[in-house]
């Protein structure tokens, strides 16, 4: 399962969450890709603190992560963008993510026009689209147990780079 719930905060301190796809784990950092001009992108540009949640109801497991997000390199974003399906690349170029649009037809027309523009060519990544690497500073692992006596373990990154581990009461 690669779906993660991403939490960010507006400049006014209002939280918002949405589901994105986790695309990798590199050097201990969680990687996902998005439109930098989306609501989450704008919020991360002003406040890099982020939360990630993985929820597996069937397994009665959850992992909650807090940390900071930073853009990955343009080269890393380009590499991943080239691997995306053709229609997803076109969609990334034309979608004004999180902005109001007049109609679905407006989106479809823009898609058809952009697809014709790139016919037979390699679709380039738009500058407003790319990846984020989330460096965790706190991770909580939760395992459901009978009688609500769940297991909870909190990992907190210390200034020396080592993780402190504590069992938490359910």
Question: Which residues does each predicted region cover?
Answer:
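Binding-site signature for planar aromatic cofactors or substrates
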Residues: 1-170
């Amino acid at each position: 399962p690669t779906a993660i719930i991403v939490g960010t905060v507006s400049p006014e301190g209002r939280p918002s969450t949405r589901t994105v796809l986790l695309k990798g784990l590199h050097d201990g950092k969680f990687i996902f890709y998005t439109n930098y001009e989306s609501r989450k992108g704008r919020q991360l540009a002003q406040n890099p603190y982020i939360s990630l949640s993985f929820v597996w109801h069937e397994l009665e497991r959850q992992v909650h992560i807090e940390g900071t997000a930073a853009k990955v390199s343009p080269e890393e974003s380009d590499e991943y963008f080239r691997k995306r399906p053709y229609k997803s690349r076109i969609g990334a170029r034309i979608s004004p993510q999180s902005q109001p649009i007049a109609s679905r037809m407006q989106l479809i027309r823009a898609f058809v026009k952009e697809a014709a523009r790139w016919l037979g060519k390699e679709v380039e990544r738009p500058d407003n689209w790319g990846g984020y690497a989330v460096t965790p500073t706190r991770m909580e692992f939760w395992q459901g147990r009978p009688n609500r006596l769940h297991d909870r373990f909190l990992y907190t990154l210390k200034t020396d780079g080592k993780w402190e581990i504590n069992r938490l009461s359910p």
